[in-house]
Structure formats: C-alpha cells, structure tokens
Amino acid sequence: MKMTISQTKQPLASVEEHTRVTIKTLFQFLHAQGQGDYLGEQVTQLEHSLQCAYLATQSPKHGNDPEVILAALLHDVGRFIPAAEKMGKMITPDGKYIGRQSHEALGESYLRQIGFSEKVCTLVGAHVMAKRYLVATDQSYYDALSETSKRTLKFQVSHLSLLIFSIFKVY
C-alpha cells in the first residue's frame, strides 16, 4: 500500500528533498551512462530514452499521461544503474554486446524501491514483454526494428512465447 505524504510523518521539506535527490541521482546515471553508444545503434542511451519519451507524448491514447511518458523515459533504467553491472550480459555468437539480461525486471524493482508509482514501475517491467508481443503479432512492427533490436530478441523471446502470443491473438 502506498503511503501519502501525511502518512509518512516526515516534514514536507524532507519529502521534497528526497524527491529532488532521487531525480537528480537518476538523471546523473542516465547522463553518465547515456553518452556512449546504445548497443551499436546510431543513437546514445540518452538519445534513445528521450526519443521514447517523445514518442510516448505522440500517442493518441496515452500522450497526455505523465506516468506513461516517464515510464518511456526510464524504460531502460535497468541498463544503466550501478546494479546493472551484476546482471548477465547478452553477447552474440560473434562477440557483440547487445545488452543486459532482465534489465526490465531490475529497472522495475529499482524504481519501486525509490518510490515511483506502481503504473510507472509496471510499464518499465513490461516493456520487453510488450516488444515480444508486438513482434509475435505484428509483422510490420518486427520489420521496423533495427538489426540490433532484432538480435536482442534472440535473448528475450522463445519460440514458445511466440506460439503463446499467436494463440492469444486468435482468441
């Protein structure tokens, strides 16, 4: 159960300071890790995150929802927080690094621990599953993915998952 500010019995200034520090820390992680290339793509991690947030604002259904936009911005937080170093790396047979295993679960857990809303946390945790679903049910979505994104699917999806999604689509 989420507590309201009055239930925390902390002075408002203390809550505001905690929020400021949390946001500053998150953006320091994003800025520090976001300058390098994003898995071999033509954009940095920071640019990718900002693009996703921008695209979320363009959604006819969710573009006015700040939690959706925030989740889009932070969807890859599990790639760049310090705890990500402990997560397994996804390496292609030819030796290319293409991301961290279970970064979505790590990101969801991290955001929940620092007090983000359930909606933001759930969306961050579900973004890889959403990609799997879209790939399984929409060929044009798959066709529009970059080669790097397609390679990450080999680590993120199984043929059984594709079969299950296909069955759900029928029903």
Locate each region found by the language model.
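Acidic/His-rich, divalent-metal-binding segments that scaffold phosphate/diphosphate chemistry
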Residues: 2-98
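Divalent metal-dependent catalytic cores for phosphoryl transfer on phosphate-bearing substrates
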Residues: 54-171
